[in-house]
UniProtKB/Swiss-Prot annotation:
Belongs to the TRAFAC class TrmE-Era-EngA-EngB-Septin-like GTPase superfamily. TrmE GTPase family. Binds 1 potassium ion per subunit. Mg(2+) binds at S229, T250. (6S)-5-formyl-5,6,7,8-tetrahydrofolate binds at R22, E79, K119, K453. PROSITE patterns: G_TRME (PS51709). One of its GO terms (molecular function) is metal ion binding. This is tRNA modification GTPase MnmE. The lineage of its organism: Bacteria, Pseudomonadati, Pseudomonadota, Gammaproteobacteria, Aeromonadales. It is found in: Cytoplasm. PANTHER family: TRNA MODIFICATION GTPASE GTPBP3 (PTHR42714), TRNA MODIFICATION GTPASE GTPBP3, MITOCHONDRIAL (PTHR42714:SF2). It comes from Aeromonas salmonicida (strain A449). It is an enzyme of class 3 (hydrolase). K(+) binds at N225, T244, I246, T249.
Length: 453
């Protein structure tokens, strides 16, 4: 248990109708007596003045006192709900910090204390931040499911299955002289395959949850005047980029964040790529390449009125040579309203090819479906949970350990090695909920939270 008491504004900075200051720790009752002049009844809302050091009212509002362990943090907690002006909030926090033993809360420290006091696990704590940062209704619902423990429950079920299997395997190791060969009787293999299948299902759900949180970065690239900015505007549904007939109009990177069926898509329009003596345009082109090299997918825009080619290497071999091999490339032939070409998508020389008109939006629905498929979108995410990159990494490590355990069982019938791989898989899964996590990992996670959360 911590011995110090922390304070911070729990509501967002800025002006609002209501602002909340939260205090957590053993001195919460002392703060109440000093600032309120009395100890409020536990878990009852009382309308009281908030007093300065001279006993004069700073503000008046609702005071709520929670006693450990029945609070968000598991400690004594005092919440003061006053008027949400930034000056009032700052005065109230500074007044509380004058009390001996009080200090400002670090980012995420209230959630960290809730985790340390077993009020929620690590995945649930992260879900609080994800719920606040949700950029769509689907993302908010998924974060709420994680906060309610849906993701953690699935992980706990996997961990418990691994523990039961480990007990069985280790019993076979400890009693090798029994008439029955426990490692070869089919139970271990059957249970292991069932756990692997269950883990695959959780991994698939987690990938969808990570997509809801992180989305996909798509860069629109190509020669000047190919229609890149027009495509950005069409996908965004508004005039985000200036469009003219003058080559080189876009000189800097333009960003738009849209949602396709709830999945966030980060679209980036770049300067047209060409050799130029214009210093400003050169800077824009270098920035364009910096974005291209970090993309999840590149939409390679081609002016369909200038060439019939669909192979990007034929259109621009230097571009293909410079593009990192692990980045997906989609050829987008623009101005189909002028060329009259068939809009049917095709697969040519390892690249998807889409014919569109960014101006009239011909072919755009098919391109949107293609982008969803590139993200790995699997349809309705209702009932899913939110996941982060570290969760996917932990699930991947667990799956790798189980594959090794499968080989150790099937090829070598090595009980000790099977048990060790099961232990390592369990350890990886336990990192997700925080049952097995280093202090450094916890510090990185909670430091990314808002102050007051």
């Amino acid at each position: 248990m911590t011995t110090d008491t922390i304070v911070a504004q729990a509501t967002a900075p800025g002006r609002g109708g209501v602002g909340i200051v939260r205090v957590s720790g053993p001195a919460a009752e002392q703060v109440a007596e000093i600032v309120l002049g009395k100890l409020p009844r536990v878990r009852y809302a009382e309308y009281l003045p908030f007093k300065d050091e001279q006993g004069q009212p700073l503000d008046q509002g609702i005071a709520l006192l929670f006693k450990a362990p029945n609070s968000f943090t598991g400690e004594d907690v005092l919440e003061l709900q006053g008027h949400g002006g930034p000056v009032i909030m700052d005065m109230l926090v500074r007044r509380i910090l004058q009390i001996k033993g009080l200090r400002p809360a670090r980012p995420g420290e209230f959630s960290e204390r809730a985790f340390m006091n077993d009020k929620l696990d690590l995945a649930q704590a992260e879900a609080i931040a994800d719920l606040i940062e949700a950029s769509s209704e689907q993302a908010a619902r998924s974060a709420m499911h994680s906060l309610q423990g849906q993701f953690s429950s699935k992980i706990q079920q996997l961990v418990e299955s691994l523990i039961r299997l480990r007990i069985y395997v280790e019993a076979a190791i400890d009693f090798p002289d029994e008439e029955i060969d426990f490692l070869s009787d089919g139970k271990v293999a059957g249970d292991l395959y069932a756990i692997m299948a269950e883990l695959d299902g959780v991994r698939s759900e987690a990938k969808q949850g990570a997509l809801l949180r992180e989305g996909m970065k798509v860069v629109i690239a190509g020669r000047p005047n190919a229609g890149k900015s027009s495509l950005l505007n069409a996908l965004a549904g508004r005039e985000s980029a200036i469009v003219t007939e003058i080559a080189g109009t876009t000189r800097d990177v333009l960003r738009e964040h849209i949602h396709l069926d709830g999945m966030p898509l980060h679209i980036i329009d770049t300067a047209g790529l060409r050799d130029t003596l214009d210093k400003v345009e050169q800077i824009g082109i270098e920035r364009a390449w910096a974005e291209i090299e970090q993309a999840d997918r590149v939409l390679f825009m081609v002016d369909g009125t200038t060439t019939d080619a669909i192979d990007p290497r034929e259109i621009w071999p230097e571009f293909v040579d410079r593009l990192p091999k692990d980045i997906g490339l989609t050829v987008v032939r623009n101005k189909a309203d002028l060329t009259g070409e068939d809009l049917a998508p095709s697969q040519e020389l390892g690249h998807a090819v889409y014919r569109i008109s960014a101006k009239t939006e011909l072919g755009l629905p098919a391109l949107r479906e293609h982008l969803k498929a590139c993200m790995g979108f699997q349809g309705n995410t209702e009932g899913g949970f939110m996941a982060r990159r570290r969760h996917l990494d932990a699930l991947e490590r667990a799956a790798e350990r189980l594959l090794v355990a499968k080989d150790q069982l099937e090829i070598y019938v090595a009980g000790e090695l099977v048990a060790e791989e099961l232990r390592l898989a369990q350890e990886s899964l336990s990192e997700i909920t925080g049952e097995f996590s280093s202090d450094d990992l916890l510090g990185r996670i909670f430091s990314s939270f808002c102050i007051g959360k």
